[in-house]
Structures are given as C-alpha cells and as structure tokens.
C-alpha cells in the first residue's frame, strides 16, 4: 500500500519521497488517518510546520477520538514559545525569499541563517541558502548547506540537483586560472538572477 511504502521511505530518510507517496494515499482515501498523521510527521521533520499542522487538524476533524494527531497538536500548542518561534520562522523565510527575488542576497543569507538557527530541519531554507551561495561563487558553503539538508532528506530531488550543479561548478573551477575564475563567477551571478526561486508554499 501507499502507506507502507511511505513509512518505509520515511524510515530510510527519503522524506520527500515519503511525502509524495503519502499524499497519494490520502488522495485515494481522505479518511486514512494513519497516512495523514504520518504525512504530518514527515512534513514536521522537513521543517514544514504549517503543512504538518494542517494534516493533523484535518485528521482530528475526521476522527476526534483516539487520534495520535491530537497529542501532536497539544504538545506543540502547550509550548507557547515554540508556537511563536515557528510562526516567526515562517515570516523570516518569506522575508529572505523576498530579498532573494530582489537580488539583495546578503540580506537574504542573514535571514536564512536566522531561520535555520530556529528551525534547523527546514529543507527549503538550506536549499535557498545553497542557491545564494552558488550564485555568489561560494561553492564550498553551498555544498555544505545542501549536504546538511540531505542528512534530513537524503533523496530530495532539488537537493540532489543542486549538489550536482555545485560539483560541476567546482570541477570546472579547478580547470580555470584565477582571472577566468572571477569572470566565470560574475557570469554565474547573472545566470542565477534569472533562476526561479522556491516559493514558501511549495512542498
């Protein structure tokens, strides 16, 4: 079943694969509480707190009694500081996203570091940070950021793609002299400006 496949992927830290499989499961059967609750846990582990809460709330609406989702919600809501921190993190990520879209990369990077300090599992923040470092020619930092994200979700397609691109740029840099290296980085910045950034609502 989709649920069992999703559970296996989650245990193997293929979180994006698990989320995709579990979404199919709840699409086929909206009342599949086990799949919906697990999907919420997967989202939460990826730093996607809004999506996690959404799944758990829907789950408790479908089955109010004897539902583990109620415990998840209560545990988080009882910690007022945690709720406030999570809400603040979302706002900070959206600010960082706006800075990135406007080309204010330094400010975006500062915001993303704050986001990851508060929510160290936020995959999208690592990905955007890596993209900005890549844009600035800071390949080692970009690679470090992506590798951190892949410790959380090792099969994330976007992370795999970014890591491949980073490695390609690093390999190319080794073949060029310092002057050409700087010119290449300037050209890279122009290419990255046109790249579509992640949306805070994408999963």
Predicted features along the sequence, with ranges:
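Register position in tetratricopeptide repeats
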Residues: 11, 45, 79-82, 101, ...
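TPR-adjacent "capping" and linker segments in tetratricopeptide-repeat scaffold/adaptor proteins
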Residues: 1, 77-91
